[in-house]
Amino acid sequence: MVAITLPRVLWGTKSAPKHVLLVHGLGSSAHTMWQLAEAFAEKGWCATAVDLRGHGSAPRTSTYRIGDFADDLLLTNPTHQGNWDVVIGHSIGAASSVVAASRDKDWTKKLVLLDPALTVGPERRQMVIDGQRYSHDHLTEDEVRAENPHWHPINIQQRVSAPKQASRFALEQAVLDNTDWNTESHAAALTIPTLVVGGDPAVDSMFTGSHAEAVLASNPLITHTVIPGTGHSLHRDKPQETLEAIFSWLV
């Protein structure tokens, strides 16, 4: 599959001394990373968020393997054409970033994975595809607000608009094309400092149990922290706490 050029949204100035790339999860968009991007820009960074293939205003394609997402990300470089100071990915965006970083050791200096979907088994795969179909076809702001009354109003609105802006085919194929959804070997091959910021397993997390233990044991460069009381969308549940975990690790 041919890699594509991903559309970008920037916060801060291109001449900033440090550059962060933000990679959204399935059914989201570049704009859904706004709170993280804004916080980095306020600290003097240039924050770039992209629409993954099939999402937002990105080109539509015929395949949506994690390797395809990774190929697109490897074509995504900072405006100064160097490497990223840090790449932050959520869910499948995190898995794709892991694959990209394992393929090109100079792509980014550091990696932050927000509740990464590194391995997804059959039961969870079905939950994901059912949820994506419902979000694309039926989800309303009232539903999101009732389930997440603590979310910022912008996040509520974007939780509804982003999956509808994405290609329904892309949302389905991102699950169906990845019949063996397992990027653990790529995580083990990482050669850069990597932080996993996980959701609370008591709420909902895709990085937990024996899977998380195996990933952490496979690579001493990977560290793990959990934001209590958050689910899979921890950057929406508790954005400030998520940012504090990231910035304290980056120091």
Go through the PLM ranges and name each one.
Residues T230-P239:
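Catalytic histidine-centered segment of alpha/beta-hydrolase-like enzymes
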Residues L190, V196-G198:
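Short beta-strand/loop motif that positions the catalytic acidic residue
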Residues V98-S102, W107-L139:
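Flexible "cap/lid" loop of the alpha/beta hydrolase fold
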Residues G89-G93, S97:
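Gly/Ala-rich beta-loop-alpha elbow adjacent to hydrolase catalytic centers
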Residues G198-T230:
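Conserved loop-alpha-helix segment in the C-terminal half of the alpha/beta-hydrolase fold
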Residues V9-P59:
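Conserved HGGG/HGGXW glycine-rich cap/lid loop of the alpha/beta-hydrolase fold
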Residues E42, C46-I88, T230, E244:
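Active-site loop/oxyanion-hole signature of alpha/beta-hydrolase fold enzymes
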